[in-house]
Amino acid sequence: MKPMLKDFSNLLLVVLCDYVLGEAEYLLLREPGHVALSNDTVYVDFQYFDGANGTLRNVSVLLLEANTNQTVTTKYLLTNQSQGTLKFECFYFKEAGDYWFTMTPEATDNSTPFPWWEKSAFLKVEWPVFHVDLNRSAKAAEGTFQVGLFTSQPLCPFPVDKPNIVVDVIFTNSLPEARRNSRQPLEIRTSKRTELAQGQWVEFGCAPVGPEAYVTVVLKLLGRDSVITSTGPIGLAQKFGYKLVMVPELTCESGVEVMVLPPPCTFVQGVVTVFKEAPRSPGKRTIHLAENSLPLGERRTIFNCTLFDMGKNKYCFDFGISSRSHFSAKEKECMLIQRNIETWGLWQPWSQCSATCGDGVRERRRVCLTSFPSRPGCPGMSLEASLCSLEECAAFQPSSPSPLQPQGPVKSNNIVTVTGISLCLFIIIATVLITLWRRFGRPAKCSTPARHNSIHSPSFRKNSDEENICELSEQRGSFSDGGDGPTGSPGDTGIPLTYRRSGPVPPEDDASGSESFQSNAQKIIPPLFSYRLAQQQLKEMKKKGLTETTKVYHVSQSPLTDTAIDAAPSAPLDLESPEEAAANKFRIKSPFPEQPAVSAGERPPSRLDLSVTQASCAISPSQTLIRKSQARHVGSRGGPSERSHARNAHFRRTASFHEARQARPFRERSMSTLTPRQAPAYSTRTRTCEQAEDRFRPQSRGAHLFPEKLEHFQEASGTGGPLNPLPKSYTLGQPLRKPDLGDRQAGLVAGIERTEPHRARRGPSPSHKSVSRKQSSPTSPKDSYQRVSPLSPSQCRKDKCQSFPTHPEFAFYDNTSFGLTEAEQRMLDLPGYFGSNEEDETTSTLSVEKLVI
């Protein structure tokens, strides 16, 4: 009975269920939950019941977002389908939240309304799970790190409008627990946009928040405020920690470098400690060998090799941050360090010098410190030696030789020393030999005859007529002395020197002798000696009662060549009475006396005789010295036959000319003053010169005067007066005699008359006016001299022009052309021309005409 009752109960239940289910309407979800952004699809089952009258209805299912009540999508059911399953794709669920599925029927015929009914279902959507990770970037030293985003949920492949996510990173300098008692923490936010991916790394830069940094990562959907996931804050020091970078094994030479790699966005600040890892008993503390502190921002430190033992040992290094941190980060790294000692120790003190005196050697040593004594490898020398110099040894005590001193440099030094000394001696000997050869190897150039009757002037200088200087050189192309006088035909022997024809002059043989003579004579004769001599003679004439005299000087560019020349030649006197000798003592003699006649049986005087005659003293103190060339070449030149005529023995050089210099014209000067102190010297010199003239006058030889030349001479000497007839001493074969005083005065009248037109034209000079008052009678005898025309250097070099007689044979010579030119007449006083003192009262003005006292 019981089993039959049980079966009936089951049948009844089935019938009841069929009735209920057949008439019910519903909307059911297969899965109550869903994951947003995932690739899962949402399935919804539905069923609805048709009415009894069989009216058709339209049924739709809506997907609504519960928070905003917005419709996401709508799906319609078929009219003939009362039950089934609807599929909603994954791309409808982009965001986590609550969703509603609602089924709503719609009537097709509005005439028959029916009551509204509605079925719904609830769906909860969640975010997928993303794992956030932090990592060091490859550019950790530049302050960057990486954020990793990973999920295990398969993501929906959005065909269109794929959503993007935003990663926010927040940097802080403290933990939330520490913010209660401190100020507002520093917070720096940075964001990056990225695509939706199942796994990816996003790189971020560090923010300067301080030595400690904390990071919070937030993942959001772009355009939405909902947060997909959030991680943090994460301490970067705890996350990454500090790392000690070193090699596992090294050989220590100078030091061991340890580098600390800090966490990203964190500055290093701590202490690096080194200790030796060795087995120790339990409870024994590790001994630290050294500690190096790292300042803020520094990453490297070096430990010296002297801290480590020799050989190979294991040492460990650890790094600890400052105690202010909320956590204690310890990083430990160990490594094997091999230390091989191969270095020099300290130098030992210097040893004593090897010698007690002189040069010695001292040395010092050092030891190589190495781990392998069998094969030391220290570079360099273990022994060093140096020279030591002590007190010098005595001459008999030789210095001890140095055993370690190299011999090569010493020998080379000795060779250099000997060579230098030899070279110096050679130079000294050569200098001495050259000096001796130049002093004694050359012949004497000048032979100066001494004069015993020379009287010095009060100024302690020798006068120009006190000494004859012989210059051994040939005559220059100018007026010459003695044997180098102007040449002419043999028939010109009887003509006075002032009337002879000029001729060619032999070339100069030795110019150096003339220059040497002039330079030596400058040291003996004062430049203006001739002018002072004229003043002395003038004073002597005043004392002796002489009233008038005239002197003509040839003034050249050099004071050595100033020469006084009488204005007109006078015949020599036969003899001198004592009165005449006393009068002639202060009378200026002509430097051009006529040449004595030579007898027919005798030859003309040779050059040697003429030179000997020239070597005598000068007649006038104002005359120049004798050239050395006359004595040097007198033996090599021929006699008068080689020249065109014989030269006067008393002919003296009157001027020296040079082409490059401008000639100074000759001026006629008066002898203004004569100091009383020089009068005795002058008289003594006059007597000495007369004695020398007589001594050197040739006795056995004379000059021949031919008859025709004697006639010319008589015509040239004048037309009337005492000088017209030839004196008896001028006959052939008779020696010449001195002209007396009367003949000389009478022969000079013509010279006085020729000077009068010039005086009348220019007027008397001041000296003439003052002197003319003292004249006792106009007919008193006067010593007058004829003026000699001045010559330019070029004329004297080319022609040696001189006056010639008025004989028809000499008619082509114009005697008037040898007078003074206008330029010479316009010349002012000679002392001003030579730069003398015009304010001297004893100096008279020099003029070009005869002056009368």
Curated annotation (Swiss-Prot):
Residues 436-853 are cytoplasmic. It is found in: Endosome membrane; Cell junction, Focal adhesion. SMART domains: TSP1 (SM00209). GO terms for molecular function: extracellular matrix binding. GO terms for cellular component: cell periphery; endosome; endosome membrane; focal adhesion. GO terms for biological process: focal adhesion assembly. It is a single-pass type I membrane protein. Disulfide bonds join 353-388, 357-393, 368-378. This is Thrombospondin type-1 domain-containing protein 1. Keywords: Cell junction, Disulfide bond, Endosome, Glycoprotein, Membrane, Phosphoprotein, Signal, Transmembrane, Transmembrane helix. InterPro entries: THSD1, THSD1_D2, THSD1_D3, THSD1_N, TSP1_rpt, TSP1_rpt_sf. The gene is THSD1. Its main location: membrane. Residues 671-686, 767-795 have a biased composition (Polar residues). Part of a complex composed of THSD1, PTK2/FAK1, TLN1 and VCL. Interacts with TLN1.
